[in-house]
C-alpha cells in the first residue's frame, strides 16, 4: 500500500509469524487539522499573525470591490455540461500556471481518469468542485475528494492574471470555512512543499508505504529492499531538482523582476497620463477578446492599485501608435506600451 497518511488508522490483522510487515516513511504530507476550531476566523488567528490576517482581508475586499465575485461549491449537484466546462477551464489554468513556473504537472498522465470518474463522485458527495467566478469566468478552480470527515485536496489552479489579489490564498480560506460548516475535520493538501501549504498547514507528517510479505521468501525481501532504495533515490533526485528549480527561479526574479510569462511574451511599460486623447485618435477594445488577452493582467493590476470596479474600466488602442493602449478608470488613466 502506498502514500498512506498518518491520520489513517489501518487495522491490520495479527500476522502469522510467517509474514513480515515493513513500513517506509516517504514524502511529506501537508494538512490542516480543524479539530477544535469553531470557524475559519479562529483557525486564521491560530495560524497567522495580525499583519498576515490583515493582508488577506485586504486582498479579499479588493477582489470583491473590483470584480463581481461569486464563490460556488458544487457538492452533490452539477450538470454534466457545467462539469465538462469547468474541467476544460481547469486544465487551461493549470497549463498556463505551470508554463509560468517552468514546471511539469504531476497528475498530467492521470487527467483523463480523474475527469471520467469525478463527475459521479460529486453527485454522490464524495467529491466537490470549488470555483471562484468573476462574473461567469472561473478564476480559481479546486477539485477535492471527501470521505468520512476528511477533505482531500487533489487539483487546484487559478488565473495568474489575478495573482495580485491572492486568489489562491482566498481559495484556501473559503474552503476551510466550508469544511467547518460541513463537519470535515481534516483538509489534506497532500504532498509538495509549497509556500502556501507551509503558511496554512498546522500539521506535517510523512506518507507511509506498507510492505507485507512471507518471511521465508528471500526474493520478496530483496524486492522490498530494492523498492525502498529506489524510492530513496527517486525522492533525493526530485528534491535536488526542486531546489535547483527554486534557486533558478528566485535568481531570475532577482536579476529581472518581471515575471517569466511577461519575459516570454513582451515587456510592458506604463505611463500615467493626465488627460485622454481625442476620440478620433483612439479605438475602444474589449480585453475579453482573445486578441487582447495580453492586456488583462495589466488592467487587473490597475484596478487593484486604484480600487476601480470593472464597470468603470475602459480600454482603448491608440490609432497612430504601434502597440500602445490606454486603460481608463473613473479616477485616473494610464498609457500601456508593449515592447
Predicted regions and their residues:
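Charged, amphipathic alpha-helical linkers/stalks
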Residues: 213-265
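A conserved beta-strand-loop-helix scaffold within acyl/acetyltransferase catalytic domains
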Residues: 4-16, 20-163, 267-339
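A general structural signal for short secondary-structure boundary/capping elements
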Residues: 47-52, 66-67, 74-80, 136, ...
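Conserved beta-strand positions
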Residues: 1-3, 189
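Aromatic (often tryptophan-rich) hydrophobic motifs at membrane interfaces
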Residues: 112-222
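A short, structure-level motif marking secondary-structure boundaries and short turns
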Residues: 44-45, 103, 160-162, 178-179, ...
Amino acid at each position: 500500500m502506498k502514500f498512506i497518511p498518518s491520520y489513517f488508522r489501518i487495522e491490520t490483522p495479527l500476522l502469522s509469524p510467517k509474514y513480515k510487515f515493513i513500513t517506509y516513511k516517504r514524502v511529506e504530507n501537508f494538512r490542516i487539522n480543524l479539530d477544535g476550531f469553531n470557524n475559519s476566523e479562529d483557525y486564521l488567528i491560530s495560524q497567522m499573525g495580525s499583519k498576515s490576517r490583515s493582508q488577506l482581508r485586504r486582498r479579499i475586499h479588493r477582489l470583491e470591490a473590483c470584480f463581481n465575485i461569486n464563490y460556488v461549491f458544487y457538492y452533490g449537484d452539477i450538470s454534466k455540461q457545467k462539469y465538462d466546462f469547468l474541467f476544460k477551464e481547469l486544465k487551461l489554468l493549470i497549463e498556463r500556471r505551470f508554463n509560468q513556473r517552468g514546471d511539469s504537472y504531476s497528475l498530467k498522465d492521470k487527467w483523463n481518469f480523474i475527469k471520467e470518474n469525478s463527475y459521479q463522485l460529486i453527485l454522490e458527495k464524495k467529491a466537490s468542485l470549488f470555483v471562484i467566478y468573476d462574473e461567469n469566468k472561473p478564476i480559481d478552480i479546486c477539485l477535492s475528494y471527501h470521505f468520512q470527515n476528511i477533505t482531500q485536496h487533489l487539483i487546484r489552479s487559478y488565473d495568474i492574471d489575478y495573482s495580485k489579489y491572492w486568489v489562491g490564498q482566498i481559495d484556501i480560506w473559503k474552503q476551510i470555512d466550508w469544511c467547518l460548516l460541513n463537519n470535515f475535520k481534516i483538509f489534506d493538501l497532500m504532498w509538495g512543499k509549497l509556500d502556501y501549504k507551509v503558511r496554512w498547514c498546522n500539521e506535517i507528517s510523512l506518507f507511509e508505504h506498507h510492505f507485507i510479505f512471507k518471511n521465508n521468501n528471500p526474493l520478496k525481501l530483496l524486492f522490498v529492499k530494492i523498492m525502498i532504495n529506489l524510492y530513496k533515490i527517486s525522492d533525493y533526485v526530485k528534491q535536488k531538482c526542486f531546489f535547483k528549480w527554486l534557486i533558478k527561479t528566485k535568481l531570475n526574479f532577482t536579476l529581472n523582476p518581471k515575471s517569466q510569462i511577461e519575459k516570454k511574451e513582451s515587456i510592458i511599460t506604463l505611463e500615467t497620463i493626465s488627460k485622454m486623447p481625442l476620440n478620433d485618435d483612439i479605438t475602444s477594445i474589449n480585453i475579453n477578446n482573445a486578441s487582447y488577452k495580453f492586456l488583462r493582467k495589466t488592467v487587473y493590476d490597475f484596478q487593484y492599485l486604484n480600487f476601480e470596479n470593472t464597470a468603470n474600466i475602459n480600454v482603448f488602442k491608440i490609432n497612430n501608435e504601434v502597440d500602445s493602449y490606454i486603460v481608463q478608470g473613473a479616477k485616473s488613466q494610464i498609457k500601456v506600451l508593449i515592447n
